[in-house]
């Protein structure tokens, strides 16, 4: 069986990284329209947009929090130092969520953070070839404990663009895919 899905796919949502207030208003209006269309539970498949979840929650429907569900899944395996591949806004959300679970977020810094953002925006332009994949694998390795890395014991794909460049087989550590976690949580919530 498949669950019924009502979707508002809006590529005109303002950038969640640079125009957060505007994004929250648009996301809130989208959530209200989904409620009118018959939605009974809401989910937002953008990690960074969870910083604007208050606007979505104003619709008054249950909201599946992608960041919280992913943090739960990541610590379930026992890791306590978890590398987060996410935008700066997503990093803040994951650092707080992991801290609430007694785990530490290991984050990209400096040139690696800039390289990550370049890869994310590249995916949005359709750049998903071998060079982009190698770039994401290098960043994952930078977070890993081997080879002088940052010491992560597991990884979170905390941006939905990440799995388009790095899958679990190519990751140097166990990888929790936030999009997969959200999809599973949606199915579970709707099958109740």
Task: Label the model's feature ranges.
Residues 1-192:
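Non-catalytic structural scaffold of enzyme domains
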């Amino acid at each position: 069986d498949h669950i019924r899905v009502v979707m508002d796919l809006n590529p005109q949502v303002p950038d969640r990284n640079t125009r957060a207030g505007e994004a929250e208003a648009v996301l809130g209006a989208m959530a209200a329209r989904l409620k009118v269309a018959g939605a009974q539970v809401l989910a937002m498949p953008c990690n960074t947009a969870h910083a604007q979840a208050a606007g979505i929650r104003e619709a008054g429907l249950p909201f599946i929090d992608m960041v919280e569900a992913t943090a739960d899944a990541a610590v379930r395996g026992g890791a306590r130092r978890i590398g987060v591949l996410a935008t700066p806004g997503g990093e803040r959300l994951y650092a707080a969520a992991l801290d609430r679970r007694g785990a530490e977020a290991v984050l990209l810094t400096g040139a690696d953070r800039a390289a990550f953002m370049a890869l994310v925006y590249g995916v949005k332009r359709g750049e998903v070839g071998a060079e982009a994949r190698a770039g994401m694998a290098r960043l994952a390795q930078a977070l890993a404990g081997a080879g002088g890395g940052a010491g992560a014991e597991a990884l979170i794909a905390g941006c939905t663009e990440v799995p388009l460049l790095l899958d679990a087989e190519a990751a140097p550590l166990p990888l929790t895919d936030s999009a997969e976690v959200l999809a599973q949580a949606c199915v579970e919530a709707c099958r109740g």
